[in-house]
């Protein structure tokens, strides 16, 4: 069954023009990849957002962080707030897998840096989380380095939304949640800018 987006039902939110895909990947260079874990009691996963074509550690993409729900267990946001840069791709997973995904990001970034002739002495992985314990047996911590690498390998401009990756076990206001994305194109003076989001 093909997954539908809200616009497929004739509902058009907002008045601002969308990008080509109406997704975060309308921002040039941004890629998204998922690895979904569906086995026995585990329904979870990991989603990675690659911020651009260059090695993030070497390029230092401009970034900011805003905490809407102070109950989260995210990693890496303090340095983003302090320095205003992103040194790694962003990963999203379930609450109890933040540490394992953080570890995998460190390994992946070290490999990328060594390939580019860099020797990082400190890396600030950014990992966001959502507690998916109502659908997923969260204590089994089913997401590890293998799944993070699979999500990286799947990273592309076209990506699935809904019940995939980090959205696999999510619930939102008592309903099944998932991954969603959108983009808008705005004009400032004569120049167009694309804003993309992934939730």
Describe each model-derived feature in a short phrase.
Residues 1-199:
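Alpha/propeptide regions of enzymes that mature by internal proteolysis
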